[in-house]
Amino acid sequence: MKKIFTLLLLSSFTLVSEAQIIKTSLTLTVRDELGNTVEGATVMLFENDADYASEKNAVAEGITDKKGVIKFKDIKSVSFLVIARKGDKDNSGGGEQIGKLEANKFNKATIVIQ
């Protein structure tokens, strides 16, 4: 009976640890040329140059919140090309690519639009 209880106890820890695995995520903060956060900026992520150039087939997209932040959850652990835009400002000319994301981690980056 003691062995069965021990086995059940150990297997329950295994189930809990598998359920707590962190999925790869990316938190982007969009700032203007003065360093202020930008609310309402449109952000798109692309995996390849062709899609980035044509602005089609974004793997994820959204709009920044009032703190200039957007979160992408459960995404691939790859390098992304980014377009961030609000009005006549965007990130072209710099900061267009994010290095490979670390798998099963909370990744962060800042994009500057001007």
Region annotations inferred by a language model:
Residues 64-72:
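Glycine-centered loop-to-beta-strand initiation motif
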Residues 42-62:
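Short amphipathic beta-strand segments in non-cytosolic proteins
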Residues 97-114:
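Extracellular beta-sheet/turn segments enriched in Thr/Pro/Gly and aliphatic residues
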Residues 60, 70, 107-109:
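Short strand-edge motifs at loop-to-beta-strand transitions and within beta-strands
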Residues 4-13:
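Sec-dependent N-terminal signal peptides
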Residues 76-89:
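A short, solvent-exposed beta-strand micro-motif common in secreted/extracellular proteins
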Residues 13-19:
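Sec/Tat signal peptide C-region and signal peptidase I cleavage site
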Residues 28-39:
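Structural motif
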